[in-house]
Amino acid sequence: MNFSDIYHSDEEYFRKLKDLKAVHEETMSKLEKMYQDKLNIKDIQAGFIRDGISDSSSSSASEKSCSHPALSVTSLSEPDLDGSSSLSTTTDEGLPDLEEKTPGESSAMVHAQELINNMWNDFSVEDYIQYDSDSRTAKKKRKKAKSLTPKITVPVPFEMTVREQNRREKALSARSDLETKLLKRDEDDAECKKKFRANPVPSCVLLPLYEDLVKQSEERRKKARERNRAALLASLKPFKFIAREEQKQAVREKKLRDLFRAKRKTNQFKAKPVPRFIYRPAASDKPKEEELYGDSRMLPKVRDLLQNSPWPSRSACRRFRDPRSPAKPRGKHRRRCLRRDGDLEKWKEPFSEYSFLKCPMLCEECCLHESPCDSDKRQKLLADIRADEEILRETRRPGRSPRRKSPGRSSNPKPRPHECSPPMPTASSRGREQAIRRSEKARMREYWQELEEQEEKLQKRPMLFERVTQVVFIG
């Protein structure tokens, strides 16, 4: 936005405002003149009527009555005619117009003019004291008393002119304020449009001078040390036994590798199968098993024998009957079978001499008829064996030596006779075996740790020429 355009537009606005003000003042003056003429005509007509009615009144009273409205006319016209022409001039200017307007009433107008001209003759303020109580109170209310000047008037500016002057001053001040506000707003807009982007703080500011010097000196020292080391290495002659030391190191490493491979191959643990005697029943179960086994072998033979044997005589039947038992009624059809208890007891004894060794399959079949307490013990034993195998499988590492055989268990158990049962593992034997296993694991762990430490020492040990160079650098 250009300020010159604003300035020209403001000038044009004020110029038009002044033109309008001049036109307004002209119209207001015309209106004021017309208003005064109207007021004068009304006052003159009222005085003429009063003079016609009072025929026998005295001349002094008529003069006072006529002068009183004239004064009222002046009093009415004074507040509106501040700064204008005097009352006499206005009346002189207005009378010719009245004569033109009312030619039939020329005598009345002449009489009124004479009254106006002789109005100030024998004038005294005391004559109006008794009549003008209201005007006196109104004068007291005024801020400043006005002196009675019949012919000379003090020019006082109109309120409208004062108001216009104040408006002009306010407009000028408002214009200056508007210009300053516009300038300030433009400056603020220009400042707001600017984008401040601060540059990062340079790194040299954060580092003090002393640290820079120390860093530079350290770099120079390192460069000098590297230069001296390169010169010494260039001037160093290799010894004759360097190749021999390298060969020894290669042979040593090869031996270690072969040793580790052999240990990995030989030390792999392989669990042996559980011996069959563990699954055999206990010694307390053997009589029961033998009895069941004998019954199972004898029953078919007894049945075959009973079926093929002839029927016994009546005397034999009477022998087996209990005399104390009540007599049973004889029916048409009799049972032709023997009592089970007596027959079995009778025929069981001759076949007891058939005793022979039991095969493993029959032994396993008889194990199905064992007592629940023995089966629980056997299940616990098998669970312990499986747990030991799982622990060994978890803790086993390639290259370890096999676990030492426990005294309680042997890989090749001696054949025991059929009559004796294997010893059952107790809590103390289990604790002993666990302690042995723990000690073996600890010893193997220590052994492998020692081997690793030796390897680290061998790898970290410098060669002879390296030690010589270190001695040279230190010297």
UniProtKB/Swiss-Prot annotation:
It is found in: Cytoplasm, Cytoskeleton, Cilium basal body; Cell projection, Cilium; Cytoplasm, Cytoskeleton, Microtubule organizing center, Centrosome, Centriole. One of its GO terms (cellular component) is photoreceptor inner segment. Its main location: cytoplasm. Residues 53-107, 314-337, 389-441 are annotated as: Disordered. Residues 54-64, 82-93 have a biased composition (Low complexity). Residues 255-434 are annotated as: Required for interaction with CFAP418. GO terms for biological process: cilium assembly; cilium organization. There is a cross-link at K377 (Glycyl lysine isopeptide (Lys-Gly) (interchain with G-Cter in SUMO2)). Keywords: Cell projection, Cilium, Cilium biogenesis/degradation, Coiled coil, Cytoplasm, Cytoskeleton, Isopeptide bond, Ubl conjugation. Residues 162-234 form a coiled coil. Residues 430-441 have a biased composition (Basic and acidic residues). It comes from the Eukaryota. Residues 327-337, 398-407 have a biased composition (Basic residues). Disulfide bonds: none annotated. Expressed in the retina. Belongs to the FAM161 family. Involved in ciliogenesis. Interacts (via central region) with CFAP418 (via N-terminus); the interaction is direct. Interacts (via C-terminus) with microtubules. Interacts with LCA5. Interacts with CEP290. Interacts with SDCCAG8. Interacts with FAM161B. Interacts with POC1B. Interacts with CEP78. Forms a microtubule-associated complex with POC5, CETN2 and POC1B. Interacts with CCDC15. This is Protein FAM161A.
